[in-house]
């Protein structure tokens, strides 16, 4: 059985990245700073996502109205 080339490359890359992370002495130099950066990234993503929520809600309402109109048209056409 032959292993696909991309799978072999992926295994090598993952193995090397893991070994390099563990081998490097300052891989996790300051866990508090990393946790703070992750929390800040989530807060920024949430702040950017909020203005999109009303647009998504209106698009969903429009799709629902179109589906109802389509079903009404179909029921008149069939029945």
Curated annotation (Swiss-Prot):
GO molecular function list: toxin activity
One Gene Ontology CC term in the entry: extracellular region
Residue list for modification Valine amide: 78
Organism field: Rhytidoponera metallica
Protein name per the record: Ectatotoxin-Rm1a
Propeptide: 24-51
Signal peptide segment: 1-23
Keyword Signal: yes
Residues annotated as transmembrane: none
Subcellular compartments: Secreted
Keyword entries, A-Z: Amidation, Secreted, Signal, Toxin
Tissue expression as described in the entry: Expressed by the venom gland.
Keyword Nucleotide-binding: no
Function: Toxin that paralyzes and kills insects.
